[in-house]
Amino acid sequence: ALVTLPEDYIDALPEGSTALLVEFSADDQNQLTQLEQKLNGHIAKLESSLVANQLFTTDSKVIANLWKIRKGMFPAVGAVRATGTTVVIEDVAVPVAKLAQVVKQLHQLFIQFGYDEAIIFGHALSGNLHFVFTQAFETASEIERYHEFMDAVSKMIAIDYQGSLKAEHGTGRNMAPFVEMEWGSELYLVMSKLKQLFDPQGILNPGVIINDDNKAHIKHLKIMTKADDLIDKCIECGFCESVCPSLTLTLTPRQRIAVWRQISLLQQKHQAGVITIEQQQELNTLQQDYQYFGIDSCAATGLCGQQCPVGIDTGLFIKNLRTKSHTDGKVSQSIAKRFESVSTIAKFGLSSLQLANKVVGDKVMNHTFSAMSKVSGNLIPKWYKAWPAGAKPTSIINNSEKFTDKVVYIPACGNRIFAADNNAQDKRAIQEVIISLLNKAHIEVIIPQQTDKLCCGMPWQSKGLNDSADAKRQEFLKVIKQASAQGKWPVITDASPCALTMKVEEENDAVSIYEISQFVAEKVLGKLAVNKTDETFMLHTTCSSIKMDDGQFLHELAHACSNNIIIPKDIYCCGFAGDKGFYQPELNKAALAPLKAQVPNNCSRGLSNSRTCEIGLSEQSGISYQSVLYLLDQLSCSNV
């Protein structure tokens, strides 16, 4: 593989240069070493023709990055395509001995038909090539250019090189007109008769593989309508879908974008006065249904943007739609201005609900809250068994010892409002735990007096209420700058979403803002003696931790505490998304559907670093989730 090279160096590469990514494995280290030596011997023979060489590595991060480059080639073309064009990918195979010759001839066809942006990649060992190019379908001349190019490519592969027009992927409609040319009339007739026997009415995937229309590939073409600058580069590759919490509930990011493009296309027709009655009905239905399927059921945490090869954050797009449909009304502004009072009322309400639940039970509470939620138009949240009581006032907990080293600590809203999980072994407030840990490391904890009125602004931002969000952020920044002596002392917060919000928003870096896991891993862990346990724990990495540091510090703390940490498969964003889990618990339930079955019988505790996420995790898993700091404090003592 090519090493990372400056752009001007890459531009200066000889014409026809190729990057080859080689991966091999063995049953043991000895065999692996022998294989590496053998391969290096072969590579040495090619020294004169090598432009650059990356040494073989067993570093999992380096390997992942190399594969990320390779897998990102197809979608990356979409990032530079003109708005409104479509990315086309084809998949062919030829005899390995002819591979280099085919690559050269493909490049010649790209030049001949004006596909200057086209790229080729594939699997050299199998003689398999993927070529990607962008295509506009808005004019007859563009469609004809595409038609002639596909004719030329198909003839070259199937006839000239006796290759296959499809290797890894299905024939589809684009190659269906060329199947007879590839296999010959006699075999094509056999295929057609088999199709007729199995599917006499032609209802199973019609027009795919067997298609008598030799122009089927240039009909019913999909138009990539210009819809929004944030999403116009999307090529609908679907890389984002696996991590989306609404994958099995409503729409994925790719589908949200595809549906919005259709809405935009129909809106353009409506504005131009050329929309049909049927299209108007479709537009009305899509706009109505998109509110829940596209907007309301989106967690908007942006984890999809981490997977997207061109960095499209569909969550941000959805937030912008919320901004357009919501305005900062008097209620949201009043809550922002009176946040301390609202928090106090919320804590009282939570504690009262716990008392009521003890009297009437979960079943009655569930029915009551479901009815109230329905009557209120979902303004009243649903009932959760995992709903905690209200937390203690921060002022009661603020009892740090005095030390030379100091840190400013802003407890997040969720940890100031929600008490520890009802079924937790350790029911201390998280503030007590953090003060205990930091004092063990001889660090004084400063909690500003104004803390209870502070918020990073994320609850408003996620709903598109940007004015209120910005007001709370500015208030937050003003307090921490003063409390930290203009940046002399670092600032920590105990919820990863809040830390991410403030890290993104703090422009001048006058104050160092840490998510608590990072601060403890870097500044505290080395000053503790940890009595590591063999107890089994589930670990959930929050979206914000993934976006900040790929969960590195959270994982480091968890593994410092236990030899048995389980990271469940197919769990990404938990779908709780701040307070959304209270109002749309179906999203949290769908996102965490695979979780409970992966909790072993000997496991009763889960670890994370966001209180609201932990509420949903506890509800869906059947075990109690808490901040990893509880466990670290329980197992550690000072060694300074």
What are these regions (language model features)?
Residues 55-58, 81-82, 168, 204-210, ...:
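Short coil/turn segments at secondary-structure boundaries
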